[in-house]
Amino acid sequence: MEVKATTILAVRRDGKTAVGGDGQVTLGSSVIKHTARKIRKLYKGQVIVGFAGSAADGLALMERLEAKLEEYRGNLLKASVQLAKDWRMDKYLRRLEALLLAVDREHMLLISGNGDIIEPDEPVLAIGSGGDYARAAALALYRNTDLSAREIVEKSLKIASEICIYTNDKFVIEEI
């Protein structure tokens, strides 16, 4: 059975970055969990990572990113590049089905199994089934209001939860 889930959104404004995710996990046509935690702080609280896709795969990739962060002393960009290289070249890792969104004080990155590391033009990034809805809402709020990063994440995730059937309104939000 295919496991679908998640909207993860990151917004940076005025030196603060907020990353939020919903808590829904869907198996087939049933919601099996409402309060899953899909974002974590890594490397002494200096990096926030969220995942979309298979939970086991996402957690495995988070662990590997954490090891790379330790190896590269918290340098998110270098750790992400090395993770993406490993992910693309390793026969086992290539089968993992997840996307990572990782942020620190300087960078906001989408990391994929294709070897992609994408940093957005504007300080708004989203992944997952409701990611496009959350990103559109966040960009509108970012461009047209003075809301904080956290407020933009909250309001945008709420909008995504009203549109995407794989996204609920049980949010976890972390800030750095």
From Swiss-Prot:
The keyword Disulfide bond does not apply. Signal peptide: none annotated. Belongs to the peptidase T1B family. HslV subfamily. Keywords: Allosteric enzyme, Cytoplasm, Hydrolase, Metal-binding, Protease, Sodium, Threonine protease. Allosterically activated by HslU binding. This is ATP-dependent protease subunit HslV. It catalyses: ATP-dependent cleavage of peptide bonds with broad specificity. Its EC number is 3.4.25.2. GO terms for molecular function: metal ion binding; threonine-type endopeptidase activity. Its main location: cytoplasm. GO terms for cellular component: cytoplasm; HslUV protease complex; proteasome core complex. Na(+) binds at S161, C164, T167. Protease subunit of a proteasome-like degradation complex believed to be a general protein degrading machinery. PANTHER family: ATP-DEPENDENT PROTEASE SUBUNIT HSLV, METALLOPROTEASE TLDD. It holds the Pfam family Proteasome. GO terms for biological process: proteolysis involved in protein catabolic process. It comes from the Bacteria. The active site is at T6. It is found in: Cytoplasm. The keyword Protease applies. A double ring-shaped homohexamer of HslV is capped on each side by a ring-shaped HslU homohexamer. The assembly of the HslU/HslV complex is dependent on binding of ATP.
